[in-house]
């Protein structure tokens, strides 16, 4: 069975018993107790049941084996050594499908370490992201980073299923994500390229989820489970297709010939809608572009566009701007050297400089970054031996990487692109990266998380009459992220 068939079958299973139907069918009998059960527990049970139903009819392709084994053993009270091969008897597992109320109640009494382990199994089982059918299935009932902005600003939960674009820009972005990740690792972070993570479901609420494009400052234990270290770095990658041009383009050639901020700003302004929005200090930006600046050398000739700020964001936008306007971006300009005898193009760093460019907090990508940082911080807190002693400088930080490429020349078409001995065959040529740190306001992040949890609970109640508890961990997040006063 190929990936498309697996995805279609798993999607059919998910549609056959959506989350609301699962709540009514399996948990309505314990409706008085369900409001005392954190939704994170309910979510694990729903994932378990979905996997059981899929695997029962597809013995030739078992999904989520480790998660099923752990929950099966827990429910049965069995203790099996991790190295032992546990038999997957689907007929027996299907019987456990009817024990969801018991499983929910039992997991509520389970040690936090065990529950956190289950969420780490979910992450491990969904690695590969878009190439993993389970990743797609679990995102269905999750407030992901791409949905956060719309849900928060419109107060409408059910209508937002996330943006889905399938144009050439998205295809190019997906095609170049691996090479961009490699460039960040070699030329910015200067660390080894790490495996991409799967879906990070928020272990406190079970409502939120994040999928990271790149992450550093992590490790994996002997079971392959994620371990988040202090000062982990998160990178959200954005491929700017609208700047993909030929090498002979005037602004491309000028940037390569004399890589300075002047040639860089000229390149940015050469597009009718510049990727960096200029505003005078004190003015509120539009929400069109996710990067902005107060620097006049990025001021376009045409009239600046304005748009209203969503009402719920209006009281906070100036404070969020003040936090982020102090950040600077790093620009790395690349060129390549051809080795015709070896049929290779080796990429090298031609220049690096900083620019007064920062993230626009009115843009949806800012909110995307907030959720990624929040969820990753939950994993860091759970991994920490003394969470109460976490300093604000130790929690994960997030950067947005803007990738600019140029097209290959005719002579370069047959050459392999080489970055640190790794070869890329079809990708275009890197021109520049803009690496921009995001400065979140922990109090604002907590407000967003709390508001959406309440909104989510109300929507579930309207659909099922069940009072489901979407527990958040905003207090422990705030304690970790806010600078602690120095003791005398």
Swiss-Prot record:
Tell me a Gene Ontology molecular-function term this record carries: endonuclease activity
Species of origin reads Human herpesvirus 6B (strain Z29) (HHV-6 variant B)
Keywords, A to Z, come to: Endonuclease, Exonuclease, Host cytoplasm, Host nucleus, Host-virus interaction, Hydrolase, Nuclease
Record's GO cellular component terms: host cell cytoplasm; host cell nucleus
Q: Where is this site: Required for function?
A: 177, 213, 236, 238
Question: InterPro entries recorded for this chain?
Answer: Herpes_alk_exo (IPR001616), PDDEXK-like_dom_sf (IPR011604), Restrct_endonuc-II-like (IPR011335), Viral_alk_exo (IPR034720)
- What's this protein's family per the entry? Belongs to the herpesviridae alkaline nuclease family.
Instruction: Summarize subunit and interaction data from the UniProt record for this chain.
Output: Interacts with major DNA-binding protein; this interaction increases the nuclease processivity of the alkaline exonuclease.
List where this protein forms a coiled coil.
none
Q: Which Pfam families match?
A: Viral_alk_exo
Lineage summary: Viruses, Duplodnaviria, Heunggongvirae, Peploviricota, Herviviricetes
Please indicate if the UniProt record lists Nuclease as a keyword: yes
Functionally, this protein is described as follows: Plays a role in processing non linear or branched viral DNA intermediates in order to promote the production of mature packaged unit-length linear progeny viral DNA molecules. Exhibits endonuclease and exonuclease activities and accepts both double-stranded and single-stranded DNA as substrate. Exonuclease digestion of DNA is in the 5'-> 3' direction and the products are 5'-monophosphate nucleosides. Additionally, forms a recombinase with the major DNA-binding protein, which displays strand exchange activity.
Documented EC number(s): 3.1.-.-
Q: State the Gene3D superfamilies in the record.
A: 3.90.320.10
- Record SUPFAM superfamilies: Restriction endonuclease-like (SSF52980)
Name by which UniProt lists this protein: Alkaline nuclease
Query: Signal sequence span per UniProt?
Result: none
Identify which top EC class this enzyme belongs to: hydrolase
Q: Where in the cell is it found?
A: Host nucleus; Host cytoplasm
């Amino acid at each position: 069975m190929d990936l498309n068939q697996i995805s279609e079958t798993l999607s059919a299973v998910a549609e056959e018993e959506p989350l609301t139907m699962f709540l009514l069918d399996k948990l309505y009998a314990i409706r008085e107790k369900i409001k005392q059960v954190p939704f994170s527990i309910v979510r694990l049970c729903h994932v378990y049941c979905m996997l059981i139903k899929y695997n029962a009819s597809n013995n030739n392709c078992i999904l989520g084996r480790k998660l099923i084994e752990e929950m099966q053993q827990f429910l049965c009270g069995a203790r099996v050594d991790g190295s032992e091969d546990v038999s997957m008897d689907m007929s027996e597992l299907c019987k456990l499908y009817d024990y969801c109320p018991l499983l929910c109640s039992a997991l509520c009494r389970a040690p936090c370490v065990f529950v956190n382990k289950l969420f780490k199994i979910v992450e491990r089982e969904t690695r590969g992201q878009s190439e993993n059918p389970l990743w797609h299935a679990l995102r269905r009932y999750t407030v992901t980073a791409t949905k956060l902005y719309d849900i928060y600003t419109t107060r409408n939960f059910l209508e937002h299923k996330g943006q889905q674009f399938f144009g050439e820009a998205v295809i190019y972005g997906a095609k170049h994500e691996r090479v961009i990740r490699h460039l960040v690792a070699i030329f910015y972070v200067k660390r080894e390229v790490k495996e991409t993570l799967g879906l990070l479901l928020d272990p406190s609420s079970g409502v939120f989820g994040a999928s990271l494009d790149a992450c550093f400052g992590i490790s994996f234990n002997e079971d392959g489970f994620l371990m988040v270290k202090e000062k982990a770095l998160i990178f959200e990658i954005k491929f700017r297709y609208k700047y993909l041009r030929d090498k002979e383009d005037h602004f491309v050639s000028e940037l390569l010939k004399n890589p300075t901020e002047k040639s860089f700003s000229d390149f940015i302004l050469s597009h009718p809608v510049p990727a960096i929005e200029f505003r005078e200090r004190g003015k509120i930006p539009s929400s069109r572009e996710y990067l902005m600046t107060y620097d006049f050398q990025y001021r376009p000739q045409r009239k600046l566009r304005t748009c209203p700020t969503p009402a719920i964001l209006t009281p906070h936008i100036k404070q969020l701007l003040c936090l982020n306007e102090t950040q600077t971006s790093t620009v790395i300009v690349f060129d390549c050297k051809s080795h015709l005898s070896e049929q290779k193009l080796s990429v090298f760093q031609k220049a690096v400089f900083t620019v007064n460019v920062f993230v626009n907090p009115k843009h949806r990508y800012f909110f995307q970054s907030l959720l990624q940082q929040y969820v990753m911080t939950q994993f860091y807190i759970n991994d920490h031996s003394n969470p109460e002693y976490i300093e604000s400088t130790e929690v994960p930080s997030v950067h947005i990487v803007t990738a600019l490429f140029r097209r290959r020349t005719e002579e370069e078409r047959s050459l392999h692109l080489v970055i640190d001995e790794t070869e890329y065959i079809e990708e275009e040529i890197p021109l520049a990266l803009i690496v921009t740190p995001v400065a979140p306001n922990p109090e604002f992040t907590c407000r967003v998380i709390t508001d959406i949890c309440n909104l989510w609970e109300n929507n579930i109640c309207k659909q099922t009459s069940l009072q489901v508890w979407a527990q958040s961990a905003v207090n422990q997040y705030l304690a970790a992220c806010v600078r602690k006063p120095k003791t005398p």
